[in-house]
Each structure stands twice: as C-alpha cells, then as structure tokens.
C-alpha cells in the first residue's frame, strides 16, 4: 500500500471521551471512530486488523473440521419466547416489529435459531458429530456502553455450534474447541487464562471462559499464589471450614443491644466482642413455585457478599434472586430488614460455610432496634443447612490447599459451553440412534468476541508512543520510510525495490511516499504499531546501508541494504 493513497486518520492528541488505553489508542491510531454511544465505524487500518484476526480464527476452525454458515441478524421472537430468554435477557434485547406486525429480535447470539434450523436438517446419528460456525455482527442494548469496543451495542463474534448423539462425543468436541481456542490466542500473542465459569444466560452443564488480564477488564479471575488453581469470581471457592465450635469455655454471656440512632455499626462497634467479621446478616429471598415455603433465610457474614450464581444451584431458591419486599419482611418477621435474625422463623434457613464456625457472634433479633450479641450454635440457635454461597476474598485459602487466593481484573474474550439438551429439548429436536430409537440432540456452543480481542491485545501491548502489534495481526507488517522520496532518485529506487519485493512475497508493506516531515511519519508509524520499519536515506545508501527498526523490541540498527530482503522474509515466516 502506498501511503499517499491511504486514509490514516491519526490524531495527535488523546480524545477527551476515551475511557481506557485501548479506546484512546484506537481513536488516535485511526482504527475506529465513534458513531453513537456503543457503535463504531471501522476505518481502513481497523478493518485490516479485523480481517487478520478473522483469518486466524477461520484457519483454526477449518483445522478442527468446522464448516462456516451465515444466519440472519433478525430472529423470530417466538423462538426466544420458547426458550424464555426473551425474559432473562430483558431490556438488553433489541426488538423489532415489521410492517405486518411480526416481531423479531436482533440477535445477541444464535442458539435458538441454530437449533430450530438443525431440527429439519439432521435425521441420523451418522451425520454426527457436526460443527457449524459463523462470523457475524451481534447486538445488545447495553445500558451503559464503555471502554471503547470492550462493551458496545454492536460487536463482532465468531459463534460455533456442535451437535452430538451422546455426552462422550460432546466432551471430545468441547476439548477440541478448548485446544483450538488456545492455538488461536497464542497465534495472536495474547496473554490469557482459561478458567472454569458460570454458564449464565446461555445455560448448560459446563463452561470455560478465556480471560485476558487487563486492569481495564470488568471481569475478575481468581488465582492461587502457589498452584494452578484458576476460576472466574462467580464460581471460585476456597477451603470450606464447616467446623462448629461447641467449647463452652469460650462462650460469653448473651446480651441484647439496643439501637438508639440510625448508624447501626457506630452503635455496635462500641459493644464488647463486636466485629463485622463476627456479625451475621440475614437476607430473605423467595423460593420457587413448587416449594411449600414462600421464603428462605440466607445467613452470611456481614463482611462477605452473597454470590447469586452459587445460590442459584440450590434447587429451592428462585433465580434470578427475588428479595423479600419491606412489607413481606414485616409480615413474616415483625420487623425491618436491619433487624432480621434466624430465630423462630417458619421457613428454611441456609448459611454460608463461613458462618457456621463463628462463636459469640452478633445477629438480628427479629425485634426492632434490638440485636443479640454473644450468640452460639446449638446453645442459642439451631444449626442451619450450610453451603458455599459467598464470593471469595483476596487472601482466602486456595481450595486445593496450596497458597492463598488473589484477584486479577480481566477482559472476557471467549466462552465455551456444554449446552447438553437445554435447547434441543425446548424445540423437541430428536435424532435416530444406532438402534433406531430417537434421542434428544446434545449440543455445545463456542463464542469468541472478535472486536473485543483487538481491544484486549492493545491493552496488553502498548507504550508511550502507541500500539505494539503482534506480527500476525498488525495492519502492515513493515513500513518502508524513504527520506526525500520525491527528491532523491537513489532513495526512490531502493524504496520501490524493497516494496516490490514485499508485494511479490505477499508481505503487507506500507510505502510511505507522502511529502511530510520525517519525525511526523515516524511518530505515526509507531502510533499505528507497525512491527518493522526500514528507513532509507541518501546518506546511508551511499555506504550501501539502511536503518532497520523493530517496534516490539525497540531495536534500531544500521544494516546492509541487500541484507534487508532476508530479514523481511524471516520476519514474515514468524
């Protein structure tokens, strides 16, 4: 590409509306421009990067036997009504009504549609396993788009779907896709973790996320300081100490604490033996319709936070969680939420493991303005059912007993799921097995956030001068920078010789034949992040030399002009 024919669109200053490093650099490097909140125009430089990311993904998908298809953006709403995800996604769905009053959804994902499609395409187990994928723009009505292309209303994804006659086949394909994703991200030189994760709105039996460490990330992954333990914060756990302390030697006299002002903890903090970590809060949540009780009381330490995902695994509890209203709390306990306690309740009580090994603890009394202090299990209160229902904290012991847990912010770049029969049951998709009977189809799905990957790579690869692209996805592999291109025949001839060599060998080269100051050109090339540069000047050429630069190593050296071709070829083979 000749620079004088190229739209660079670079900016000298950081735009005031950028809210993270990747966003600022993508704007400054002329990769994107904002259209509206959460939607972006991809400029020539951005599109070159995007196409290279897609090429890597397509090559690896081909290697694992996946076939590419293309599904519509518009999906029939009734399919989403069947799965009930129109409710769980809620206002995040873009819904459209056509002139005949038919309702559609702009797809954030395609599980419903692919299941509906495959129902009429597969008849026998002999056609399985099968992997289909597409690369397509998705839509989500984000309430607050942020961090540039990390959280947007419109984004590009690779979504793949696999189909199986049994779980063994699904497990095999799941592991294949897991390894394929590792290959994809390694080719992009991306630092990442594959972590056990919550299946969330997708549902299913098992899932893993691929997370790119970044301080801009909205996700949190949990790691052990001394082992290979890794998990998303939603599913992370620690060693559970469910030892109940019975030693009466440690018991203090039970007392009531009166609250005479609005600041509960200011009052309690003056009470002997009071600690937030030794105080139990009680929260009422609603149960599912089949339960004989309307509520369940949840007990958790005051300094801990309930993990809704873990609670959702308890069969009786409604999910998403529905908390009791002020009036409902008053009706069943006679007090307000600040004073609820697990005493004389007519419905089940569930406690986190961390609660059960407390002694001389503080709890609500179910009497307004009163708490009980120095309470103990079995002596003053019955022992509840115990579960792991909290978020882990930094410093908690690792569940494998090796080291402590630490937290790392990250960007979710991919997610794979064992869906099982979740969608095929809903749509009654059955297939003939080996003995001629009909079995419900088993499915997996596998997503990669293509546009988000680009932001994650920039977050991990930048310096004060701009982006440092890995070779595999850089918009150009090499920049040929002639000094006085339009004045020196010698410089022009050598520049064009190198440029034509690159074209002949299918190497993405940028010949900067613009009439502008050299320092501006060099700054622009560094900002864009082109990995290699050749600077050609008449002064150096008189000695048969040129200057060679490597962006990622910050290398600058003078080399023989004829040695350039070998270096370029070697770099292109990396």
From Swiss-Prot:
Q: Which InterPro entries does the entry mention?
A: aa-tRNA-synt_IIb (IPR002314), aa-tRNA-synth_II (IPR006195), aa-tRNA-synth_II/BPL/LPL (IPR045864), Anticodon-bd (IPR004154), Anticodon-bd_dom_sf (IPR036621), Pro-tRNA-ligase_IIa (IPR002316), Pro-tRNA-synth_IIa_bac-type (IPR004500), Pro-tRNA-Synthase_IIa_type1 (IPR023717)
Where does it reside?
A: Cytoplasm
Which key words tag this protein in UniProt?
Aminoacyl-tRNA synthetase, ATP-binding, Cytoplasm, Ligase, Nucleotide-binding, Protein biosynthesis
Q: Does the keyword Aminoacyl-tRNA synthetase apply?
A: yes
Q: Name one GO biological process term.
A: prolyl-tRNA aminoacylation
Transmembrane domains' residue ranges: none
Known EC number: 6.1.1.15
Q: Which Pfam families match?
A: HGTP_anticodon, tRNA-synt_2b, tRNA_edit
Tell me which domain of life the UniProt entry assigns to the organism this sequence originates from: Bacteria
Give me the Gene Ontology terms describing cellular component: cytosol
- What is catalyzed by this enzyme? tRNA(Pro) + L-proline + ATP = L-prolyl-tRNA(Pro) + AMP + diphosphate
**Which GO molecular function terms does the record list?**
aminoacyl-tRNA deacylase activity; ATP binding; proline-tRNA ligase activity
What's the family? Belongs to the class-II aminoacyl-tRNA synthetase family. ProS type 1 subfamily.
SUBUNIT field: Homodimer.
The record's listing under PANTHER family reads: MITOCHONDRIAL RIBOSOME PROTEIN L39/PROLYL-TRNA LIGASE FAMILY MEMBER, PROLINE--TRNA LIGASE
* Written domain comment of the UniProt record: Consists of three domains: the N-terminal catalytic domain, the editing domain and the C-terminal anticodon-binding domain.
Question: Per its database record, what is this protein's job?
Answer: Catalyzes the attachment of proline to tRNA(Pro) in a two-step reaction: proline is first activated by ATP to form Pro-AMP and then transferred to the acceptor end of tRNA(Pro). As ProRS can inadvertently accommodate and process non-cognate amino acids such as alanine and cysteine, to avoid such errors it has two additional distinct editing activities against alanine. One activity is designated as 'pretransfer' editing and involves the tRNA(Pro)-independent hydrolysis of activated Ala-AMP.
Q: What is this protein called?
A: Proline--tRNA ligase
């Amino acid at each position: 590409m000749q620079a004088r024919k190229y739209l660079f669109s670079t900016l000298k200053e950081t735009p005031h509306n950028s809210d993270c490093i990747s966003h600022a650099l993508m704007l400054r490097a002329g990769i994107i421009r904002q259209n509206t909140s959460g939607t972006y125009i991809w400029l020539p430089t951005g599109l070159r990067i995007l196409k290279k990311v897609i090429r890597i993904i397509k090559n690896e998908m081909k290697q694992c036997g996946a076939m590419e298809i293309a599904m519509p953006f518009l999906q029939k709403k009734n399919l989403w009504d069947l799965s009930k995800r129109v409710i769980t996604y809620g206002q995040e769905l873009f819904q459209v009504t056509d002139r005949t009053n038919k309702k559609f959804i702009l797809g954030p994902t395609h599980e419903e549609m692919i299941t509906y499609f495959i129902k009429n395409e597969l008849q026998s187990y002999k056609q399985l396993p099968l992997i289909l994928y597409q690369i397509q723009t998705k839509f989500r009505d984000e309430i607050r788009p942020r961090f540039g292309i990390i959280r947007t209303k419109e984004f590009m994804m690779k979504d793949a779907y696999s189909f199986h006659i049994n779980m063994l086949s699904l497990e095999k394909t799941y592991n294949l896709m897991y390894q394929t994703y590792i290959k994809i991200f390694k080719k992009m030189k991306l630092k990442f973790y594959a972590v056990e994760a919550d299946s969330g709105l997708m549902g299913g039996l098992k899932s893993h996320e691929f997370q790119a460490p970044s301080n801009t990330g909205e996700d949190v992954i949990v790691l052990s300081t001394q082992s290979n333990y890794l998990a998303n914060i939603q599913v992370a756990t620690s060693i559970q100490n469910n030892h109940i302390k019975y030693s009466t030697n440690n018991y203090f006299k039970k007392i009531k604490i009166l609250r005479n002002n609005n600041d509960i903890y200011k009052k309690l903090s003056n009470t002997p033996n009071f600690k937030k970590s030794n105080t139990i809060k009680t929260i009422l949540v609603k149960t599912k319709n089949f339960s004989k009780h309307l509520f369940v009381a949840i007990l958790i330490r005051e300094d801990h936070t309930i993990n809704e995902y873990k609670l959702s695994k308890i069969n009786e509890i409604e999910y998403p969680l529905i908390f009791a209203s002020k009036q409902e709390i008053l009706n069943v306990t006679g007090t307000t939420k600040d004073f609820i306690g697990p005493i004389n309740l007519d419905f089940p009580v569930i406690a986190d493991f961390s609660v059960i090994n407390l002694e001389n603890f503080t709890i609500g009394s179910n009497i307004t303005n009163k708490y009980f202090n120095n309470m103990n299990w079995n002596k003053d209160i019955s022992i509840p059912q115990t579960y792991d229902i909290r978020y882990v904290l930094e410093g908690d012991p690792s569940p494998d007993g090796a080291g402590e847990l630490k937290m790392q912010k990250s960007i979710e770049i991919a997610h794979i799921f064992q869906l099982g029969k979740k969608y095929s049951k809903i749509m009654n998709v059955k297939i003939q097995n080996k003995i001629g009977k009909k079995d419900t189809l088993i499915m997996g799905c596998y997503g990669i956030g293509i546009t988000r990957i680009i932001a994650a790579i920039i977050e991990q690869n930048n310096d004060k001068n701009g982006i440092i692209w890995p070779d595999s996805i850089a918009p150009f592999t090499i920049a040929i920078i002639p000094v006085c291109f339009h004045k020196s025949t010698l410089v022009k001839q050598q520049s064009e010789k190198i440029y034509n060599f690159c074209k002949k060998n299918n190497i993405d080269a940028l010949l900067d034949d613009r009439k502008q100051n050299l320092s501006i050109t060099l700054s622009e090339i560094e900002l864009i992040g082109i990995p290699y540069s050749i600077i050609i000047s008449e002064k150096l050429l008189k000695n048969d030399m040129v200057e060679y630069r490597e962006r990622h190593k910050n290398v600058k050296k003078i080399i023989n002009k004829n040695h350039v071709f070998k270096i370029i070829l070697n770099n292109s083979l990396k």
